[in-house]
């Protein structure tokens, strides 16, 4: 009887030049050699084979011989090779330019709607007055702490809207921006034009060690000139979160001038009138607060305005600090030829503030805001999503927040303890820690 094998069409004879399988169908042996010699046929002793004596006297084995297919060896990369491939240098020049990011952002994200912007002002101002009226009416010590937190957060929201006026993202009308900006910022004791101009300097020089204006690093030389009380204030929580009013008066260590004085080196001669106007508005607001102290009493003013004002200051310092510090990876600061507007802007960070995102007008979408401050706040989330594919690893996805951004407190504390100064030399530098500031602190590896 001829050996039979299955074909696509049915059963066909197995050619005599091939030996029949010598193992059962559970075998993984595929040493299957052609032979022309009848001596290659041997009787199978497999219990699963079906032997029949052929006319030649040889036993045919019809066992199913299944073997694994031939596989190509897989060469795994060593952990070191994989690490080199995955390693990302945030200080390296990006493979894209500002125009690439701009092109990825939908055109409607650049459109400013003054009526929509004004609607946010009306909403926030109405909430501020409603909170004050409710707290004054209820006037008990269960309500007051809740009021302070809520009202301080709303003062901070007013600051963000005034901040949009300063950038021109509120509307295309400079006069409208100026009027609304003065009303909002003066109400929380911020000199609108003085701050607007210094904040413009911050955006134009973001990420530059010497030329940046807000929360920029101190060089080691300047750090070593600070007296102990200044160091303690600057690197101790919560004191550092109360820094903003002092910054307005005297700027940061290593810089001179004031946001209130028209002759400060912050300003150009042509900006003198603007600075005087804002300082006059600030003075008028301060005078109004003094009058209210005599009208309703200093204790009531402290409860209604004073404590919420300082909560607002803490929000401002908390948010602005974390937009430039505290990432788990060390981020570079630049000098000289290594600095560019794009590279400096890419060192900023987005943050998620949970329920507060909507209240403070999505200020946490900070990367795109820093690169393109003309985009209105109500388009920043969409613009950020559109830009992510271009930014790639240069965009650092923020940690998701719960209802309140409590996760950021640990990040803030860690950064305050570790980010003290940068080297006096070098065009790409990173923060270092002073091991003697608090005694023993863990210093980041360079």
UniProtKB/Swiss-Prot annotation:
Annotated GO MF terms: sn-2 acyl-lipid omega-3 desaturase (ferredoxin) activity
The organelle targeting sequence, given as a residue range: 1-65
Location(s) in or outside the cell: Plastid, Chloroplast inner membrane
GO cellular component, one term: chloroplast inner membrane
Topological category with respect to the lipid bilayer: Multi-pass membrane protein
UniProt-listed Enzyme Commission number(s): 1.14.19.35
Tissue specificity field: Most abundant in leaves and seedlings.
Domain notes: The histidine box domains may contain the active site and/or be involved in metal ion binding.
Protein family: Belongs to the fatty acid desaturase type 1 family.
Protein name (Swiss-Prot/TrEMBL): sn-2 acyl-lipid omega-3 desaturase (ferredoxin), chloroplastic
Lineage: Eukaryota, Viridiplantae, Streptophyta, Embryophyta, Tracheophyta
């Amino acid at each position: 009887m001829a050996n039979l094998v299955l074909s696509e069409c049915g059963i066909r004879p197995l050619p005599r030049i091939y030996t029949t399988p010598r193992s059962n169908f559970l075998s993984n042996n595929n040493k299957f050699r052609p032979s022309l010699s009848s001596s290659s046929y041997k009787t199978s002793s497999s219990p699963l084979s079906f032997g029949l004596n052929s006319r030649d006297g040889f036993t045919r084995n019809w066992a199913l011989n299944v073997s694994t297919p031939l596989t190509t060896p897989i060469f795994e990369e060593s952990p070191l090779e994989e690490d080199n491939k995955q390693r990302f240098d945030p200080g390296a020049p990006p493979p894209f330019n500002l125009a690439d990011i701009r092109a990825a952002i939908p055109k409607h994200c650049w459109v400013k709607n003054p009526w929509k912007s004004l609607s946010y002002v009306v909403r926030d101002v109405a909430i501020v007055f409603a909170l004050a009226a409710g707290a004054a009416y209820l006037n008990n010590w269960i309500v007051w702490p809740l009021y302070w937190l809520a009202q301080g957060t709303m003062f901070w929201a007013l600051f963000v809207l005034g901040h949009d006026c300063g950038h021109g993202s509120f509307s295309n009308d400079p006069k409208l921006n100026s009027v609304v900006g003065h009303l909002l910022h003066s109400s929380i004791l911020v000199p609108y034009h003085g701050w607007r101009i210094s904040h413009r300097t911050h955006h134009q020089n973001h990420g530059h060690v010497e030329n940046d204006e807000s929360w920029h690093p101190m060089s080691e030389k300047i750090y070593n000139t600070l007296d102990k009380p200044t160091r303690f204030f600057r690197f101790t929580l919560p004191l550092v979160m109360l820094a903003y009013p002092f910054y307005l008066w005297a700027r940061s260590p290593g810089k001179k001038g004031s946001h209130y004085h028209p002759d400060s080196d912050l300003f150009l001669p042509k900006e003198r009138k603007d600075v005087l106007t804002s300082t006059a508005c600030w003075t008028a607001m301060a005078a109004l607060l003094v009058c209210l102290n005599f009208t309703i009493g200093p204790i009531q003013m402290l409860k209604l305005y004073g404590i919420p004002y300082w909560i607002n200051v803490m929000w401002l310092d908390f948010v602005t600090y974390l937009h430039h510090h505290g990432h788990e990876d060390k981020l570079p600061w630049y000098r000289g030829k290594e600095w560019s507007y794009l590279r400096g802007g890419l060192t900023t960070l987005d943050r998620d503030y949970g329920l507060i995102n909507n209240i403070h007008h999505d200020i946490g979408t900070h990367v795109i805001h820093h690169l393109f401050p003309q985009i209105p706040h109500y388009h920043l989330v969409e613009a950020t999503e559109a830009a992510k594919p271009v930014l790639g690893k240069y965009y650092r996805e923020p940690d998701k927040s719960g209802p309140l951004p409590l996760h950021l407190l640990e990040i803030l504390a860690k950064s305050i303890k570790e980010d003290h100064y940068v080297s006096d030399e070098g065009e790409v530098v990173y923060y270092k820690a002073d091991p003697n500031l608090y005694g023993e602190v863990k210093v980041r590896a360079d």
